[in-house]
Amino acid sequence: MARRLFTSESVTEGHPDKIADQISDAVLDAIFEKDPLARVACETLVTTGLVLVAGEITTDCYVDIPRVARETIREIGYTRAKYGFDCDTCAVITSIDEQSSDIAQGVDRALEVRERYGNEDELEATGAGDQGMMFGYATTETPELMPLPISLAHRLARRLAEVRKSRLLPYLRPDGKTQVTVEYENGRPVRVDTIVISTQHHPRVTLDEIRSGVLEHVVKPVVPPEFLDGSTRFFVNPTGRFVIGGPQGDTGLTGRKIIVDTYGGMARHGGGSFSGKDPTKVDRSASYAARYVAKNIVAAGLAEKCEFQVAYAIGVAHPVSMMVDTFGTGRVDEQTLVKLVKEHFDLRPAAIIKELDLRRPIYRQVSVYGHFGRNDLDLPWERTDKAEALRRGAGL
């Protein structure tokens, strides 16, 4: 029997990098509420007493970015100076330019239109906002077709926030991290080997109180008991103290949790982050589309695991390459799957935006606890509406 361990991590909404992601996506949502055609690339830095929002934004609407930043920080829970960060007293600095005209011309009129070898329809006219490769992944390990380690890590992180905000564990503060190690046997998850939870807390609570509270009210409600046994290891605040947290403890930046945002390291990653980017940026939109493709292939029963790669050239509408890897679990060959993808999915940027209805203020909600496998949200890239057509196309 082949056994191996695989580990994934998540972070809470109060983690400094996630504060930055949430502010960037809150700004994007605020702009999209007024101008769905805006071009947005919004980056955020948070540190002790300071928020810096910078980027390239092209829009005719006005958004009060400092107000958006403060409200986001307030909702996360940094509402008092003794937490090390305060939504009302921190400084908020903005530095915003318009999108580069050199980039804009390639997005506004794709190479296919400029050189007149493409159609003059609206879906052909929009070029990719950058070069790069994006990956999507799906697996039968969980009902949401996500890897079990990242699924459990996200659920533990979300539960930490829930018990803090409901005051079930009133001594918790916003910053926190989770990590789950799952043991696999012949490619199937069989048990949880290790759980690590680090959570910011009130200075006068004891470590024993934190450990017992977290195990009882965070771990037990989240991790299925059949995955726990007498050998499962639990590490709760293993440094012994986590009072200084959030931006006071670490500087946070947009886009530094790309593995947390996706598949917990189980799949490859093209390197591009999501938050603060409008959907003409294929780092975001094509990653969502790639998940849509991979999930439908797995939902169709064509493979137990599927990784899909798509790649683009800046200013060009059509992808330059596509690749499917089923890791030996496919019921049809991978070349056939690529052919089926080309038949059933239009992966030009404008087509992705239209198919997934991405010019809406839907991004703040996915800026924490993962962009994929979110059964708590109605996300278009999580639909499996093309599974039956793929199954028929494969002759199954």
From Swiss-Prot:
The reaction(s) annotated as catalysed by this protein in its Swiss-Prot or TrEMBL entry are: L-methionine + ATP + H2O = S-adenosyl-L-methionine + phosphate + diphosphate
| Statement: the UniProt record of this protein carries the keyword Cell membrane | no
Q: Write out the coiled-coil annotation as residue ranges.
A: none
Q: Which keywords describe this protein according to UniProt?
A: ATP-binding, Cytoplasm, Magnesium, Metal-binding, Nucleotide-binding, One-carbon metabolism, Potassium, Transferase
Q: How is the cofactor bound?
A: Binds 2 divalent ions per subunit.
Q: Does the keyword Membrane apply?
A: no
- Similarity comment: family membership: Belongs to the AdoMet synthase family.
Q: How does it assemble?
A: Homotetramer; dimer of dimers.
The name under which this protein is listed is S-adenosylmethionine synthase
Q: Which organism is it from?
A: Pelotomaculum thermopropionicum (strain DSM 13744 / JCM 10971 / SI)
